[in-house]
UniProtKB/Swiss-Prot annotation:
Belongs to the glycosyltransferase 28 family. MurG subfamily. This is UDP-N-acetylglucosamine--N-acetylmuramyl-(pentapeptide) pyrophosphoryl-undecaprenol N-acetylglucosamine transferase. Its main location: membrane. PANTHER family: GLYCOSYLTRANSFERASE (PTHR21015:SF22), UDP-N-ACETYLGLUCOSAMINE--N-ACETYLMURAMYL-(PENTAPEPTIDE) PYROPHOSPHORYL-UNDECAPRENOL N-ACETYLGLUCOSAMINE TRANSFERASE 1 (PTHR21015). It catalyses: di-trans,octa-cis-undecaprenyl diphospho-N-acetyl-alpha-D-muramoyl-L-alanyl-D-glutamyl-meso-2,6-diaminopimeloyl-D-alanyl-D-alanine + UDP-N-acetyl-alpha-D-glucosamine = di-trans,octa-cis-undecaprenyl diphospho-[N-acetyl-alpha-D-glucosaminyl-(1->4)]-N-acetyl-alpha-D-muramoyl-L-alanyl-D-glutamyl-meso-2,6-diaminopimeloyl-D-alanyl-D-alanine + UDP + H(+). It is a peripheral membrane protein. It comes from Chlamydia felis (strain Fe/C-56) (Chlamydophila felis). One of its GO terms (biological process) is cell division.
Length: 357
């Protein structure tokens, strides 16, 4: 097998794609491999500059052809991105290119194919995305976050372990755990979720009548109206912290008794790691992958409950929260999450790639 010295990661878009890419980068850096991130939307991810992570912004466009004008614009962006990606790959000279899904990675994968650079993919969800499905026929292998999705690829596919970056636990997290009960975390993913921001606070105010010592850690997302959410909790007499973004997410999950969230792949992976029960309200778009993610955690693992957005109401949400906070329910769901997580693969993405080359 040829020694791997350099790897390019084709990634961009939401945290659901970028977070696993950064975890993968960490794995390769420990092996002494140079890693470069290439993709659309990386300029909008501030952590890359803060942590001195090498990356190049690559234009891209979606594969949608439903709107002719947009399709023409997207085709032009794809072509510009393809030309730039090819230039960057020639300059960097990677031995392998890994795609993390979404159209943001498309030009880089196209350029890698043209340059005959071995391609690998990573699929975070229970339903493969369009780009990963398309390029899997050319890929050497696919690393996945959840083993059931492996059967949907014709090339070699295997569950791989990605490390979690846990910050040193802050005193505030420890103080919360000792001062409040229960602790509830509300999170709508890296982009936030207006549905959760609008519906969850009023339901938690009702629940607080049965749990006066409750604390809510609400992550509203970049567009969340923090002041409005704070007002609802404050008026309802609920102890809270509302933020646009949380750097210390894993420690927050560890200290929580319940998480109310969308059902993106990253939060699912983190919930399993933290073994924290959840109520999942999947985003109804994006080819239904979040609903499948939620079904897996709820029905296959037994680690929480699911409310479809079309069924969401104050009454339904309140009822689900009260059930989720029952001590027996918490115990059973934690045990189910622990049992599943203990059997997850410990093979690194690097090991998997070495086996496939």
């Amino acid at each position: 097998m040829k020694k791997i010295n350099k790897i390019a990661l084709a990634v961009g878009g939401s945290g659901g794609h970028i977070v696993p890419a950064l975890a993968t980068r960490e794995t390769f850096c420990k092996e002494g491999i140079d890693v470069l991130l290439l993709g659309k939307g990386l300029d909008n991810y501030p952590n890359l500059c803060e942590q001195d992570i090498p990356y190049r912004e690559i234009p891209s466009g979606s594969l949608s052809i439903s709107r002719p004008i947009a399709a023409i614009r997207n085709t032009r962006s794809l072509y510009i991105g393809y030309k730039k990606a090819k230039k960057e790959l020639i300059a960097f000279g990677p031995d392998v290119v890994i795609g993390f899904g979404s159209y943001h990675s498309l030009p880089v994968l196209m350029a890698a194919l043209k340059k005959k650079i071995p391609i690998f993919l990573h699929e975070q969800n229970l339903v493969p995305g369009k780009v990963n499905k398309l390029f899997s026929r050319f890929a050497k292998g696919v690393g996945v976050s959840f083993s059931p999705v492996t059967k949907q690829f014709s090339c070699p596919a295997q569950e791989v372990f990605l490390p979690k970056r846990v910050w040193a636990s802050s005193n505030s997290s420890k103080e919360l755990s000792s001062s409040y009960s229960p602790i509830i975390c509300v999170v709508g993913g890296s982009q936030g979720a207006k549905t959760l921001n609008d519906n969850v606070p009023p339901a938690l105010v009702k629940v607080a009548k049965d749990y006066p010592n409750m604390y809510v850690h609400h992550i509203a997302g970049p567009k969340g109206e923090v002041a409005s959410i704070q007002y609802v909790y404050s008026r309802g007499g609920v102890s809270f912290c509302v933020k646009h973004f949380e750097h210390d997410m894993l420690n927050i999950l560890l200290s929580s008794d319940l998480v109310i969230s969308r059902a993106g792949a990253t939060i699912l992976d983190e919930l399993l790691w933290a073994q924290t029960p959840s109520i999942l309200i999947p985003y109804p778009g994006a080819y239904g992958h979040q609903e499948e993610n939620a079904k897996f955690l709820v029905y296959t693992i037994g680690g929480g409950s699911m409310i479809l957005e079309k069924q969401l109401s104050n009454e339904v949400l309140t009822k689900n929260i009260l059930l989720a906070l029952d001590s027996k329910t918490i115990k059973n769901r934690r045990e189910a999450l622990r049992a599943y997580y203990q059997n997850k693969s410990s093979k690194s993405f690097y090991q998997f790639i070495c086996e496939c080359l």
